[in-house]
């Protein structure tokens, strides 16, 4: 930077010398002094050419001249630090300077006014049982879609109105807040305004920007929708993510604005402030890797502390959820777009962080004339005050839209008043709800009667704000007043070549970050190369006859298969990246080809390296043709095969778009290419209806090129064949029906190269035209509609429900004294010089939880709230616990305690395919004592559903969080209900209101309160609650960072006791009127406050009378009451092993029945594979003339079992992975033993595999025309069934033995190659070297192929022709001598197959029982 400054100073010095008599006058009283160095430099700056002038500025404190495009990281950071010392205050000051500069020369900034008029959005969906994701329903859906394509429509769907006749105006320079309960249509409205609605929705009405319809410009570049889903590349850092976004979005009109600004300033003789000039020139300079706008955005969003941390995902630990949410916001505001639709951007953030971000956004809106519509979940009062306008949406209708100042007045005219200790936002979200409305009725002259949303909407139109809105809408926007730069008319504002460079840089970065993946792939290649080389070792290989040639062909085939399937990893890699790609494609960040081309080009060096590694190890160890030219030609084919394989797997991923479909569809495509590549079925014997597939199979060209290159080498050509009629090489090629012309090597190379190019073009086309399979769309759920209908009474009956419960329980007290908790010192801290071996997370925590008392467990992030709860509940899987924990005076024993306690986890983990009621029945039947009758259990389930207000949702499928099924708030209530049906005495709840809007949080807290009122002991961790949620608690246990107690005791009316306690401490500021006591309490007890007051709140608490009272209470409750006995259960679990198995089987059966994407996919794959195999090997069972016929049959059996089996194994892994996380929760609650659970999962697979095997066997057996004898058919069926079953259990086992699904897939895949090599087809058993023969006997596929062949041909005495043999042997003799198959071995084969099946099932159960990958 110093060199740059010197060179600029030199050039500007020359300009100064020639223009020393120029004078500029500063406005606002600033005058240029001829002797002022800074003024001279500004004067010289004005003489630079326009392009250079717009990139050069003066930087303080040394008045250096710099090119803004060459500012270093440190320079940018210093600038940001100097300008933004206190973010909120300094951001406002800086933006004010920015706006003053523009206003001084009277430049009008472009603005956008968004109008929506009479917008109605409807969706068609299935309802009732037809909507459940069962196998028949899924099959019907597929059939209906097919018929619709043919022009027939028999689909019976129900129309759901999401938005009903909504109109409004989003004005520039004003912050608009969008409020509404769940399923009110907020997301749909935001998507509609951003022009991003799903095409399947029916939309009427009109959305305009400055009077222009969405079709007249490019809305994706004019506005930005900021999703509530955080979709990012996990291995990129926060700064890299924002820099990529900034480079893709470009600078928009910033450069034009700056150019005009500088021109006018020059004409007017105005000098800008250096800081503002530097900032504006930096953010207007395009094509820089990292810009000042990124640093600015990081600072205002509070992300600068984690800018160099990777974002993270399920596999990689990264930033927190709240920080990830801010990255999603930053990714869009870093661009030039000033019209923003922001969807729930504060989820996971505490109220102070939310306030800071919204405040900064408010300043941007005010000073840059931006247009912002933002939806928030639980805006605190101080955040709510930052907005200018409010839109209140409920049941798809607008209840209010207009200035914030008038919203309470409107509801007061309707008879409702917001209480003093209630946030306005919370009030607005509850006042339209039937359950909550009555409490706000304030008109004492009239009796309360429910006012519906439609009635509110009607009244708003007559209210003066509504009338003014209608008046404004009636006057069309004058299109001619629209600033030329307001709307964007080009799809990409950055040159395509520049976008390619941006994507290239990102791809290179991702390859570096994924180095472990590529290293693992290379290691896998090396291991497979060494295994192949030692199996086909040259000392064991001959070149004397056709049989030797066949072994070499087998080695070439295996080499081709390994390198072809080396590209399989591209499948998961591509699908993993698709969500981010689709998001960025739809936002018009870059065209699809800039994504696919760098992936292809940067894969070339990796393929070269892997190919060289493979060929270097295998070529001479196996003993292929020794000429260097043939080595290089072999290497070229292997390299091109790897490139082609990468292309084909990326194409499959881009087309299928999900792992299940890609595994199924991709495996079918590969099976077809594999079968018709010319090596399993010789070219001449492929049925005429499949001939076309041979010519379009890339593997055929690879196979031809490799075999022609090898077999036309001198050592094969100069050796005569066994009948001396031709050369041995040509004879081998003729036996396998391979082309004998040497030109076929180059034809093969050309074919592979052509397919490589073709597949990469197809990848780009698929990325361009296909959309995500499950595009997120906000739809009012049927459950919500039912809930509304069910509430037609004037009052919710659940409010007045009798709190008695059907089943009795024993109220219990939990006391704990001096609890300490330690973990091993993290490695990172030891590296920083920490000498201790243990890190203390809880320190001398003492307290009591009592029946009928609702206790809040609070503290700042890192205080140890969840840690304390996990320690007390016995959920910790590691660490060291000290202290005395007692239940009603008796020492706590975990196995007993688990039976009488419930734990509601924050993550709401449930089986996704069962309904709400089924979830509760399952929990009740496993956790209630076996003495309770079935009738009582069912009655108790109904009682609990009523208590937690889930009656109207009882038939709703739970679904996956954030994707399908229940909303977040409904899942919270289900989590509570699942624990309640166990009839516990003590319930722990971890963050029951996190991620909920105010109304949903109120519903959950009402559920919690109802639970406490039954006499149970309830403890909740809570984070930044609103006033009314905080004051719903009876007692508080407050922790400071370090796990120390600073308050334990009652809250009191209006929190007066906690307020009095802290205000009594000298120096603690008094609470402001109407301020949230929870927020105040955390602020005054923070570490910063401790440092300021020079006090340790934990020590102060220990010297207080409150502490002594608590110690006395703990001492009193630590002694059992006279005559009391400790809890005792005769068995560990409530149910017997048989009872546990029956309940687990019941739930697993439902899960399988409602998982059509798993079962239909494997059924379809098996059906398609069977029909494909049958038609390719049509009547092959009747052909017994030569050895090739037998090879074809063995090849068919081997390919079918391997592909169908691998598909079974891959497909089951995601299902088991999802259910395992549920298993961890249920096992911790002592619901069942691991054995019955594992056995139920194993048993559930049997009927599905039976069905799969039945139609597979019937199709294959009939089409291939095997002998229809009972014994042969039975053995074929049995071997196929056991094979498919052991493959399925193998997939289940890999999940149970590994920490996650991705590792399971890698672990399983590592053995598929070995199964392939040692199956007995690629190299017959007699040819396997003695040092590898042991693996043949433990390879399950080898036993399968053995059984299938022996069952069909073990007793056949027909003779066949074998090349190189003078006498024709019998088939029985040939399979025994060539393949090593003993005809009398069927019983041992059957026994071994059953053994493999049981072994894999046992290992699955063993893994589930003994391995726990959940870290707590």
UniProtKB/Swiss-Prot annotation:
It is a multi-pass membrane protein. The keyword Ribosomal protein does not apply. It is found in: Membrane. The chain crosses the membrane at residues 515-535, 549-569, 597-617, 635-655, 660-680, 747-767, 1160-1180, 1198-1218, 1246-1266, 1273-1293, 1303-1323, 1331-1351, 1385-1405. It comes from the Eukaryota. ATP 2 binds at residues 859-866. Pfam families: ABC2_membrane (PF01061), ABC2_membrane_7 (PF19055), ABC_tran (PF00005), ABC_trans_N (PF14510), PDR_assoc (PF08370). Residues 498-711, 1139-1353 form the ABC transmembrane type-2 domain. ATP 1 binds at residues 180-187. Induction: Repressed by cold/dark treatment. PROSITE patterns: ABC_TRANSPORTER_2. InterPro entries: AAA+_ATPase (IPR003593), ABC2_TM (IPR013525), ABC_trans_N (IPR029481), ABC_transporter-like_ATP-bd (IPR003439), ABCG_dom (IPR043926), ABCG_PDR_1 (IPR034001), ABCG_PDR_2 (IPR034003), P-loop_NTPase (IPR027417). One of its GO terms (biological process) is organic hydroxy compound transport. One of its GO terms (molecular function) is ATP binding. Residues 147-420, 814-1067 form the ABC transporter domain. Keywords: ATP-binding, Membrane, Nucleotide-binding, Repeat, Transmembrane, Transmembrane helix, Transport. Expressed in roots and stems, and, to a lower extent, in seedling and inflorescence. GO terms for cellular component: plasma membrane. Belongs to the ABC transporter superfamily. ABCG family. PDR (TC 3.A.1.205) subfamily. May be a general defense protein. This is ABC transporter G family member 29. It comes from Arabidopsis thaliana.
């Amino acid at each position: 930077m110093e060199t740059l400054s010197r060179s600029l100073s030199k050039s500007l010095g020359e300009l100064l010398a020639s223009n020393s008599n120029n004078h500029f006058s500063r406005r606002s009283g600033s005058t240029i002094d001829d002797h002022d160095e800074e003024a001279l430099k500004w004067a010289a700056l004005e003489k630079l050419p326009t392009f250079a002038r717009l990139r050069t500025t003066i930087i303080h404190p040394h008045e250096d001249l710099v090119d803004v495009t060459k500012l270093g990281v440190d320079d940018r950071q210093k600038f940001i630090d100097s300008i933004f010392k206190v973010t909120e205050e300094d951001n406002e000051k800086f933006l004010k300077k920015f706006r003053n500069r523009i206003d001084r020369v009277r430049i009008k900034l472009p603005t956008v006014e968004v109008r929506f008029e009479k917008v109605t959005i409807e969706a068609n969906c299935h309802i009732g049982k037809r909507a459940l994701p069962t196998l028949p329903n899924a099959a019907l859906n597929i059939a209906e879609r097919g018929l619709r394509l043919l022009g027939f429509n028999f689909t019976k769907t129900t129309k759901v109105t999401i938005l009903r006749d909504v109109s409004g105006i989003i004005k520039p320079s004003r912050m608009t807040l969008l409020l509404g309960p769940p399923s009110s249509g907020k997301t749909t409205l935001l998507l509609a305004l951003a022009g991003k609605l799903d095409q399947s929705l029916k939309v009427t009405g009109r959305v305009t920007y400055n009077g222009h319809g969405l079709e007249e410009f490019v809305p994706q570049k004019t506005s930005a929708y900021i999703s509530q889903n955080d979709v990012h590349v996990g291995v990129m850092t926060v700064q890299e993510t924002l820099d990529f976004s900034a480079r893709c979005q470009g600078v928009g009109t910033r450069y034009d604005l700056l150019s005009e600004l500088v021109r006018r300033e020059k004409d007017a003789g105005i000098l800008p402030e250096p800081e503002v000039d530097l900032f504006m020139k930096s953010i207007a300079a395009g094509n820089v890797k990292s810009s000042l706008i990124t640093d600015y955005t990081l600072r205002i969003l509070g992300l600068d502390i984690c800018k160099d941390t990777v974002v993270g995902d399920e596999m990689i630990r990264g930033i927190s959820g709240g920080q990830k949410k801010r990255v999603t916001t930053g990714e869009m505001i870093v661009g030039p777009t000033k019209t923003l639709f922001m969807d729930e951007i504060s989820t996971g953030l505490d109220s102070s962080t939310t306030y800071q971000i919204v405040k900064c956004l408010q300043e941007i809106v005010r000073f840059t004339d931006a247009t912002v519509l933002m939806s928030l979940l639980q805006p605190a009062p101080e955040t709510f005050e930052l907005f200018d306008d409010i839109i209140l949406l409920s049941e798809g209708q607008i209840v209010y839209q207009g200035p914030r100042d008038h919203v309470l007045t409107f509801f007061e005219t309707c008879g409702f008043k917001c209480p003093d200790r209630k946030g306005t936002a919370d009030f607005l979200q509850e006042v339209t709800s039937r359950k909550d409305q009555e409490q706000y009725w304030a008109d004492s002259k009239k009796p309360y009667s429910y006012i519906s949303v439609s009635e509110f909407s009607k009244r708003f139109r007559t209210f003066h704000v509504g009338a003014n809105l209608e008046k404004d809408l009636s006057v069309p926007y004058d299109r001619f007043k629209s600033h030329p730069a307001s709307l964007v008319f080009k799809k990409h504002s950055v040159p395509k070549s520049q976008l390619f460079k941006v994507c290239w840089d990102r791809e290179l970065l991702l390859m570096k970050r994924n180095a472990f993946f590529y290293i693992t792939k290379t290691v896998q290649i090396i291991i497979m190369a060494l295994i192949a080389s030692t199996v086909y070792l040259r000392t064991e290989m001959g070149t004397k006859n056709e049989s030797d040639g066949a072994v070499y062909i087998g080695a070439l085939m295996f080499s081709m298969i390994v390198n072809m399937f080396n590209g399989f990893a591209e499948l998961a890699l591509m699908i993993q990246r698709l969500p981010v790609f689709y998001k960025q494609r739809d936002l018009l960040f870059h065209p699809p080809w800039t994504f696919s081309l760098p992936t292809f080009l940067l894969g070339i060096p990796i393929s070269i390296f892997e190919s060289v590694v493979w060929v270097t190890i295998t070529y001479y160890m196996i003993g292929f043709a020794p000429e260097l030219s043939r080595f290089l030609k072999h290497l070229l084919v292997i390299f091109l095969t790897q490139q082609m394989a990468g292309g084909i797997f990326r194409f499959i991923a881009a087309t299928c778009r999900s792992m299940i479909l890609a595994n199924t569809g991709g495996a079918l495509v590969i099976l077809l290419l594999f079968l018709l590549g010319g090596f399993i079925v010789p070219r001449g014997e492929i049925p005429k209806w499949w001939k076309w597939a041979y010519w379009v199979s890339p593997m055929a060209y690879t196979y031809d090129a490799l075999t022609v290159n090898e077999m036309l080498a001198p050592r094969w050509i100069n050796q005569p064949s066994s009948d001396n009629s031709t050369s041995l090489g040509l004879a081998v090629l003729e036996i396998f029906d391979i082309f004998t012309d040497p030109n076929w090597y180059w034809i093969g190379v050309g074919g592979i190269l052509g397919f490589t190019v073709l597949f990469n073009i197809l990848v780009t086309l698929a990325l361009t035209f296909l959309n995500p399979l499950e595009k997120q769309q906000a739809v009012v759920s049927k459950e919500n509609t039912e809930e509304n209908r069910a509430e037609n009474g004037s009052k919710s009956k659940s409010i007045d429900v009798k709190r008695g419960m059907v089943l009795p329980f024993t109220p219990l007290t939990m006391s704990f004294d001096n609890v300490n908790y330690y973990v091993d010192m993290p490695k990172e801290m030891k590296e920083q010089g920490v000498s201790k071996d243990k890190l203390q997370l809880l320190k001398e925590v003492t307290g009591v939880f009592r029946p009928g008392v609702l206790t809040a467990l609070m503290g700042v992030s890192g205080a140890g709230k969840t840690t304390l709860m996990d320690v007390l509940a016995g959920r910790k899987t590691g660490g060291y616990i000290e202290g005395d924990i007692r239940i009603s005076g008796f020492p706590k024993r975990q196995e007993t305690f688990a039976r009488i306690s419930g734990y509601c986890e924050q993550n709401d983990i449930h089986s996704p395919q069962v309904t709400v009621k089924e979830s509760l029945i399952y929990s009740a039947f496993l956790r209630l004592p076996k003495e309770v009758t079935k009738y009582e259990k069912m009655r108790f389930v109904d009682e609990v559903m009523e208590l937690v207000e889930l009656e109207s949702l009882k038939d709703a499928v739970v679904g996956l969080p954030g994707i399908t099924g229940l909303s977040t708030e409904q899942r919270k209530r289900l989590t509570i209900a699942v624990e309640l049906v166990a009839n516990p005495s003590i319930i722990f709840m971890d963050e029951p209101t996190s991620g909920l809007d105010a109304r949903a949080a109120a519903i959950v807290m009402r559920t919690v309160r109802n639970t406490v009122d039954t006499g149970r002991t309830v403890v909740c961790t809570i984070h930044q609650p609103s006033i009314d949620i905080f004051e719903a608690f009876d007692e508080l246990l407050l922790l400071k960072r370090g796990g120390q107690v600073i308050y334990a005791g009652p809250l009191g009316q209006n929190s007066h006791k906690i307020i009095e306690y802290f205000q009594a401490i000298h120096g603690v500021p008094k609470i402001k009127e109407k301020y949230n006591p929870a927020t105040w309490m955390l602020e005054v007890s923070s570490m910063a406050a401790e440092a300021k007051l020079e006090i340790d709140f934990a020590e102060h608490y220990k010297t207080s009378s409150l502490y002594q009272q608590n110690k006395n209470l703990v001492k009193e409750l630590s002694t059992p009451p006279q005559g009391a006995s400790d809890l005792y259960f005769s068995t560990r679990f409530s149910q017997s092993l048989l009872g546990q198995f029956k309940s687990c089987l019941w739930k697993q059966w439902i899960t399988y029945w409602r998982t059509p994407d798993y079962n239909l996919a494997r059924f379809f794959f098996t059906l398609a594979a069977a029909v494909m195999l049958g038609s390719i090997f049509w009547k092959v069972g009747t052909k017994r003339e030569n050895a090739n016929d037998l090879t074809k049959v063995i090849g068919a059996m081997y390919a079918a079992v391997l592909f169908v089996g691998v598909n079974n194994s891959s497909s089951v892994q995601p299902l088991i992975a999802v259910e395992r996380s549920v298993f961890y929760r249920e096992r911790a609650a002592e619901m069942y033993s691991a054995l019955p659970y594992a056995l139920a999962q194993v048993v559930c697979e049997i009927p599905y595999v039976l069905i799969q095997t039945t139609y597979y066997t019937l199709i294959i057996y009939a089409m291939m025309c095997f002998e229809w004898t009972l014994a042969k058919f039975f053995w074929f069926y049995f071997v196929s069934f056991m094979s498919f079953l052991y493959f399925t259990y193998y997939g289940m086992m890999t999940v149970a033995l590994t920490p996650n699904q991705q590792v399971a897939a890698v672990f399983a895949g590592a053995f598929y190659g070995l199964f392939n090599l040692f199956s007995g087809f690629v190299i017959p058993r007699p040819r396997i070297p003695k040092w590898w023969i042991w693996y043949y006997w433990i390879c399950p596929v080898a036993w399968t192929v053995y059984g299938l062949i022996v069952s069909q041909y073990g007793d056949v005495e027909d003779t066949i022709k074998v090349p190189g043999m003078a006498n024709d042997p019998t088939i029985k003799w040939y399979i025994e001598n060539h393949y090593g198959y003993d005809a009398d071995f069927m019983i041992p084969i059957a026994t071994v197959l059953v053994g493999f099946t049981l072994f894999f099932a046992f290992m699955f159960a063993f893994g589930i029982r003994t391995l726990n990958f959940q870290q707590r």
